[in-house]
């Protein structure tokens, strides 16, 4: 293979990335990249042939050096960053600046982290005289970073006794039916044990896992790296350079920069797709019966065909028992039953018509989305409106959580940096940011936030707290040759203008205040309080379904809450496992922890946000404390229930519906639970929230259309720099030109059948929704939009970019 052939082959491989089988947006991306590359290669060959006319002997060296440079910065996923760069190369040259003498550097710093996924390929597997074939062509690649299991179905048994399987990602807990597979094979005289079958599955699953990134500025990055590489080559080379040699190096630079320009053109296009605002989809509302004040609408709900499915859901969630009938709904104890409009879509507008300031009357928003896409899309609507943000991100431990939790440190930093920065943009000027980490990530985490806030406090959460401070809990880990880890770290971040409520607590073992696990909120009686009697102390709770502050008479010793929280039970306590164990207990945080965070940094109806929502503890606590809330989560555990290997578990929507019903003693699935906080604040139920999905990067890639026509209809010196995607359709299939009436019609159903136009426009424009009517959305600024005859100019950022 000549060096020229080697270069073009390598360039194609590294630009397009490893071949991925299956379906979805990333498959469409590979097709688009391949078409783009084929045209670029033709133009590049012409330019190289012209450039080396005077120096034919330099041709092989040119290709050798081009290959040597570019192969350092490309990965199996097609991402562009430091990959196999030799350590001695000066890639850390920008450590110091005039303002700072220490800067954290990591090799994926210039990238958007997209997801971690395995690149599956169809493959044969043979061992112990058995032959298998796994067809990966139907695997629909992951949209984001959720964990998803594979499941296998028999496709056929071939004449040579090769057992062929179709492989897919599991949907809603679908599992491989090994027993049925073994029975089918036995009928076909294929002798195989369950152990050998599982071994074959494991062999297939051990395919390469890669991180997918997008370079934020590929052109600047690669040009900078080429300059560093060429300067090093220049100064370490000959002491004297002939004119011809200088000209050859100029040719090398010129060609290298053309390659860089064409690579960055496409990478920049991906950046635009990644950052484009996303459509809100598949939206519904959950509202308790007591909030539906029009009895005629309630009667319509009770007579609606969807009431059967609604009751079935309540039964699955444990809200009502199997004997529950429609006639029972009139009972006073069921006034907080959560009605989901997905079962009553034709009544949804009637229900919404009861509210004259819709967004302000909602208690919260649940958003199913990868969190970068969610934060970026809702930023115009919620910019500087969030009072407190709490996140409990993956700690980089590899534990068995429902999301990927094993990253290279550099990938984790890239994942967190952009999401933290976006989250901060949503905070009010007096808002606070809470970052919850363990010892695997707290050092890196603090580096990401230290320049974002004027004040950063460090709180130690004692995960081994007991009722008796002298006592301790221990298990098998206690006997290891190390100091047992018994804490996690909370970084409490704020600026000079902040809202903070001072909390006090009694001695939990001896107190007679009767406040349960609650803290006391201190309110100064005078301008400069210096002693306890200078304060009034109150607790927040519900009285007769009204939330407010209740005075507490202090007649015993109390203590200010410090920065070591050793009085909050974690899930090492059996009491917590019984009362609050909803789902993935190993990573779930106690409600009392979130209660303290929320009460210290917000007031009633302030917005609380968590965009690593997990099982929904933050939104559950915020709701019970009469705060508005935003929760972002992805994957199957966003739903009411989701399947695990150990059975069904309560999901985020299920938990929030349970909260709306009042956190009453509900059997899920075999024990009765009611969180301590619900008793302490006298929570009885009620609420109104919206949930929806967002279009994902993967969805957008799947729907984007790029033509195979001539990209370079007019060649020029700027052919590599000019924006070449101007003629491409992208997502313009949603538009139809009515030439007769000189109008542009918008049909968003051509993209997705379930777009929520009102929420999409609210996120896009930043305007809050006042009312939604048939064919119209009204915003709080008085403006109205006809949703049946949309002006294409309004939605342009969603479907076309340049």
Regions found by a protein language model. Give the residues of each.
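Glycine-rich adenosyl-nucleotide cofactor-binding module
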Residues: 355-377, 574-607, 613
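Conserved proline-anchored active-site loop of SAM-dependent methyltransferases
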Residues: 381-399, 608-622
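Mobile active-site "lid"/loop adjacent to the S-adenosyl-L-methionine
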Residues: 387-389, 393-415, 419, 430, ...
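Conserved SAM-binding loop
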Residues: 367, 434, 611, 631
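Short, glycine/acidic-enriched loop or turn micro-motifs at the edges of active sites
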Residues: 373, 395, 441, 613, ...
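Short acidic/His/Gly/Ser-rich catalytic and metal-binding motifs that mark active-site loops
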Residues: 395-402, 469, 572-576
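Phosphate/oxyanion-binding active-site loops and adjacent basic polyanion-contact surfaces
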Residues: 214, 218, 367-371, 408-416, ...
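Accessory, often C-terminal, charged low-complexity segments
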Residues: 1-352, 363, 379-383, 387, ...
């Amino acid at each position: 293979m000549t060096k020229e052939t080697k270069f073009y082959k390598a360039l194609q491989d590294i630009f397009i990335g490893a071949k991925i089988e299956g379906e979805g947006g990333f498959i469409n991306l590979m097709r688009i990249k391949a078409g783009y590359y084929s045209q670029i290669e033709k133009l590049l060959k012409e330019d190289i042939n012209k450039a080396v006319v005077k120096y034919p002997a330099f041709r092989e060296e040119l290709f050798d050096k081009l290959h040597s440079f570019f192969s350092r910065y490309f990965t199996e996923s097609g991402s562009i960053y430091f990959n196999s760069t030799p350590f001695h190369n000066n890639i850390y040259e920008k450590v110091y600046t005039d303002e700072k003498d220490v800067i954290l550097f990591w090799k994926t710093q210039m990238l958007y982290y997209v997801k971690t996924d395995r690149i599956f390929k169809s493959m044969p597997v043979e061992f112990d005289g058995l032959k298998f074939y796994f067809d990966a062509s139907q695997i629909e690649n992951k949209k984001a970073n959720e964990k998803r299991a594979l499941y296998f179905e028999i496709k056929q048994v071939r004449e040579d006794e090769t057992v062929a399987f179709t492989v897919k990602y599991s949907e809603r807990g679908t599992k491989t039916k090994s027993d049925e597979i073994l029975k089918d094979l036995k009928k076909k005289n294929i002798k195989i044990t369950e152990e050998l079958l599982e071994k074959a599955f494991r062999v297939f699953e051990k395919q390469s896992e890669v991180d997918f990134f997008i370079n934020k500025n590929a052109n600047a990055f690669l040009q900078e790296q080429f300059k560093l590489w060429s300067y090093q080559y220049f100064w370490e080379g000959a002491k004297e350079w002939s004119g011809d040699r200088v000209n050859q190096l100029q040719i090398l630079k010129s060609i290298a920069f053309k390659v860089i320009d064409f690579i960055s053109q496409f990478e920049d296009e991906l950046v635009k797709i990644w950052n484009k605002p996303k459509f809100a989809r598949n939206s519904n509302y959950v509202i308790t019966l007591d909030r539906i004040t029009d009895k005629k609408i309630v009667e319509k709900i009770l007579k609606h065909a969807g009431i059967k499915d609604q009751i079935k859901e309540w039964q699955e969630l444990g809200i009502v028992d199997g004997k529950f009938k429609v006639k029972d709904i009139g009972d006073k104890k069921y006034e907080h039953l959560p009605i989901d409009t997905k079962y009553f879509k034709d009544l949804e507008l009637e229900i919404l018509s009861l509210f004259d300031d819709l967004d302000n009357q909602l208690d919260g928003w649940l958003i199913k989305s990868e969190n970068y896409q969610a934060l970026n899309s809702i930023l115009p609507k919620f910019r500087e409106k969030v009072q407190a943000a709490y996140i409990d991100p993956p700690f980089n431990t590899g534990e068995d959580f429902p999301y990927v939790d094993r990253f290279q440190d550099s990938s984790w930093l890239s994942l967190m940096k952009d999401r933290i920065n976006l989250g901060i943009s949503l905070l009010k000027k007096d808002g606070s940011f809470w970052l919850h980490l363990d010892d695997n990530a707290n050092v890196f985490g603090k580096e990401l936030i230290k320049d974002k806030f004027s004040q950063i406090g460090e709180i130690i959460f004692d995960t081994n707290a007991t009722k008796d401070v002298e006592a301790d809990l221990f298990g098998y880990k206690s006997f290891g040759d190390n100091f047992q880890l018994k804490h996690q770290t909370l970084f409490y971040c704020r600026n000079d203008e902040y809202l903070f409520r001072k909390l006090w607590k009694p001695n939990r073992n001896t107190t007679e205040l009767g406040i349960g696990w609650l803290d006391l909120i201190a309110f100064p009686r005078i301008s400069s309080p210096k002693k306890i009697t200078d304060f009034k102390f109150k607790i927040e709770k519900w009285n007769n379904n009204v939330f407010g502050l209740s005075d507490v008479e202090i007649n015993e010793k109390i203590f200010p809450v410090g920065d070591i929280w050793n009085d909050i039970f974690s899930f090492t306590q059996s009491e917590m496992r019984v009362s609050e164990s909803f789902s993935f207990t190993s990573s779930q945080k106690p409600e009392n922890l979130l209660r303290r965070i929320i009460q210290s940094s917000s007031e009633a109806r302030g917005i609380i946000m968590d965009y690593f929502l997990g099982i929904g503890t933050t939104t559950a606590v915020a709701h019970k404390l009469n705060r508005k809330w935003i929760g972002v989560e992805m994957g199957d555990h966003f739903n009411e229930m989701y399947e695990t290997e150990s059975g069904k578990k309560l999901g985020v929507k299920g938990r929030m519906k349970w909260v709306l019903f009042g956190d009453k003693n509900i059997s899920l699935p075999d024990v009765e639970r009611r969180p301590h906080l619900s008793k302490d604040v006298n929570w009885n139920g009620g609420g109104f929230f919206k949930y929806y999905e967002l279009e994902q990067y993967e969805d957008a890639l799947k729907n984007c259309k790029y033509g195979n026509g001539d990209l370079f209809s007019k060649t020029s010196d700027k052919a590599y720099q000019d924006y070449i995607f101007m003629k491409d359709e992208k997502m313009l299939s949603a538009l139809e030109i009515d030439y007769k009436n000189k109008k542009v019609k918008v049909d968003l159903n051509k993209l997705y059948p379930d777009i929520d136009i009102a929420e999409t426009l609210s996120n896009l424009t930043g305007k809050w929704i006042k009312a939604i009517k048939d064919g119209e959305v009204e915003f709080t600024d008085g403006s109205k939009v006809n949703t049946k005859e949309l002006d294409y100019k309004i939605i342009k950022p969603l479907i076309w970019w340049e």
